[in-house]
Amino acid sequence: MQIVGFLMLFILLYRQPFWYTFTPVGSLLILILIPTSLRIVTIPTGGELVAYRDGIMASVSVVSDRLGHRHLKVNDRFQMGGTSSLYSDRREGHIPLLLHPDPKQALFLGVGAGVTFAAAAEYPDLKADAIELIPEVLELLPYFTESTGILSDNDRLSLKSSDARRFVASAGHSYDVVIADLFHPARDGAASLYTREHFVKIKDLLSTEGLFCQWLPLYQLDRQTLNSIIRTFLDVYPKGSAWLAHYSVDAPILGLIGSKKDIRIESDWLNRRVKQKSHYNALREVRLHEPLTLPGSYLGNGLALKRFAGPGPVNSDDHPILLYQAPGYVYRAESKPSELLLEVIHGVEAKPEDILQANSTRAHSRLSAYWLARDSFIIAGTESQRSMDPYTLLHNIEEPLLTVLKTSPDFSPAYFPLIKLASVLSKTAPDASKTLLHRLEQVAPARHEATVLMQH
């Protein structure tokens, strides 16, 4: 009440008529005396605000949508993962860890909802550190334990609140794998995480066979910004490569992976790396449990990326071009997330010999077919009309996905949606379901799911 007293005294002593003073001072009095929340949080229709923290650097909230999925948001603008992106987030952790032959120490830069970091728990010989700039993000992790487990209970996993660049510059030991989360360059300070100097410091941290993966949110970037990041990355990791986290056209994610040695995948990588059933089941949940799923995510090597990005400046501390480029994306008219993804898959060429250890004609042919199917699947995803009605959906996706499977019967992302659709149709349209299952048996005879479903 002392503040109110001083304000009233100010009004009495002020020499101008009272009404001149009333508007600004009265407004201030209202703000002080009336308890009003100044939180600005956009809540989805049918959703709710689950938790909120105001911090020195940012406001952080957990919101749920009408389906009950929880999302972590920073400053109500940047969504940092959640329960609905479990599939994608987990793959972002598994792919780099699987590409290293035997990781013992891993570093995760950025925590978000903790789902990517939680993938480290599936590797029994791995110790992992996770660094998060915003302390309030770590405070809200318990709201995502359904997807992550209780991370603090695992003595192999360590969570720390710190600045990523400072931690990297002062880390006392090397890491086999470093995974950098999805940082939007327009977020305060995030552009500095894409500088040449930062990439060099990370390279200095890597062990002899170490690798660094920088995930990029294609759905929050434009071509100019992406090219700048790629050029900067290749300036430090000339043998870098590009990988897709998944095949979604709504929120595509590209991974740039750099290493001190060439990355090669053995044909029996799955048997070599996955010793425990729990680990296999974890990979199965995110469709990384088949031999071609890991090399199938590969897009191209450093030379292909260099051609794609073209000539131009790199992002550095002295010339922070991303600092000025990235904010333009936030405020310009939104484009379809798939547009940049299509530019990437059309503009970056992959060759089986770039990534496969074995010099087998059959293995090379299968992987090439898988890549063709993958690209066709992505293109079909941008062209197909969506529907919640199973009959309409059958009409829209049956032929495109069967065509994909004819290209590569190994391509599971086209097979399982049709299996699921056949299962739904079996209750209301058994003849249509049976016809679809017969067609699946014909294009993918080595798979058994269609046959099993027909017998029930």
Go through each PLM region and give its residues.
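The AdoMet/dcAdoMet-binding core of the Class I SAM-like
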Residues: 53, 85-230, 234-237, 242, ...
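Conserved small-residue packing positions in alpha-helical repeats and bundles
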Residues: 380, 419-422, 455-456
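Short coil/turn linking the two alpha-helices of tandem helical-hairpin repeats
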Residues: 385-389, 422-430
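TPR alpha-solenoid repeat register
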Residues: 413-414, 449-452
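Alpha-helical repeat scaffolds
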Residues: 393-403, 429-443
